[in-house]
Each structure stands twice: as structure tokens, then as C-alpha cells.
Amino acid sequence: NNLSFNEHDLDYLRSLNLFDEDFIGFLRDFKFTGDIYAVEDGSVMFPGEPIIVVKAPLYQAQLVETAILSIVNFMTLIATKASRVCNAAGGDPVLEFGLRRAQGPEAGLYGAKAAIIGGCTGTSNVLTGKMFGVPVAGTHAHSWVQKFDSELEAFRAYAQTYPDSCLLLIDTYNVLESGIKNALIVFDELRAKGFEPIGVRLDSGDLTYLSKEVRKILDDAGYPNAKITASNDLDEYTIISLKQEGAAIDSWGVGTKLI
């Protein structure tokens, strides 16, 4: 019902010198009177199955055809990829982190929604969360750590801001020599104030080796419930490989190879 042509639209079409005034007048009064039938979001579809059926006069159906195909083709692509990634994760939470690598802001916005449809548990795209009511989640960036004079200072500032949801990115400099050590200092300070940390994130390096080492360190320090999140150009194949290697990873952030 909101498909219509305003006077600015009509003036532009008139300027093309392709349409007579009768047709311009026809478009001025245009209304979509057809019916659209579609499967529910998240439905499993097979090749050759209709996802959307449009029943309308030909001129109305052709006006909406390109827009519908553009939306469906893109979003089913992302939702299918997300489903593959989530299946590879074997029930672990998968977060969508793809906005920075998306093919433009609209692709990031709607791609994040499609990723949720495909099984992701949350997105770092706050606008997607606002517009579509999907869960949002994320961590701080390397630039946050680099802004401060020291990694420890950066971690403390973040923990002070988010004491009840503190998840620290520990690979800005050196995961084992500084990142996890500084994280534990901050975790102990949080615990002394009555808060428990969420965990840490790894975004580079040998994720299998580093996650196993970090898991041991966290457990030995009294944080067996702290989670390890991994990111860094992940896809379903990488996740399967990491799981086969016994990586101690609890959740996955996927972006570049998703959106």
C-alpha cells in the first residue's frame, strides 16, 4: 500500500521524454492491488521451490519484481551462509560482526538481519538491532587499547564502564605475555567489587594453541566460567578445522566471510 509515485518522481520521469502525460497521470494514481505470499523467515527451502508468489496485474508485478528479487537474492545468500557457519559451530553462539566488510551500509544493515535469520545469536550492528528488534552484542576494538598508554589501563577503563558485561580483547600486543595477564588483573579487581567477567576474545594468531593456553590460565586463576570468543576471518571451514583441533573456543564472531 505504500508503493506510489510522488510529484518529484513524476517530474523526473517526465524529464526523460520517454512517457506521455496519460501514462504520467496513470502513475500518479498508481496503487498496488495484488497479493504477495511468502514463506516465513528462516524456513528451509530447496532448489526450485517458490519463496515468494506475487499475484497481481502484470504491470504491478513487474514494478515490484526487481526490488523483491534484489532483497531475496541477497538475504537468502547471507542467511544460507550464516546457517552453514552456525551448523559448523555445533550449537556454540555465533555473532555477526560483518558491517566493516559489507558491500555498503545497506548490505551491512540487512545482511545482519539475514544472519540472525540464519542462526546467528546477535549482531554488532546496533542499527539492525533498533530497526528489527534483534539481539546486539560486541566487544571493544584494538583501537580502544591503543588509545591508552597501556593495555592494563585500557582494560580497567573498559571494565569500569561495563563491570557486569566485561569481555576483553587480549591480542592487541601479545596474548600470553601481556593480554591474558592484564585481563586477569582486571578480572580480580572486578571480582573484588562483586562482578564476574564474561571472558576474553582472540582475534589473531594460532587460535587453537592460544585458546588452549588461555583456557588453562583462566581455569588455574579461578575463572572456569569465563568464556573465550574467537574471531579473525572465520567461516564454516575454519570453525570445523578449529573444532577438530580441539580449540577451547566457546563462541565465534564472524564477519568478513559472512557479509
Write out the residue ranges for each language-model feature:
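Glycine-rich phosphate-binding active-site loops on the catalytic face of alpha/beta enzymes
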Residues: 248-259
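Catalytic cores of alpha/beta
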Residues: 234-248
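Short active-site oxyanion
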Residues: 35, 226-227
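Hydrophobic residues within beta-strands of alpha/beta enzymes
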Residues: 137, 200, 228, 250-252
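Buried, small/hydrophobic-residue-enriched core segments of structured protein domains
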Residues: 18, 24-33, 40-221, 234-238, ...
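N-terminal, Lys/Arg-enriched amphipathic/low-complexity engagement segments
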Residues: 1-29
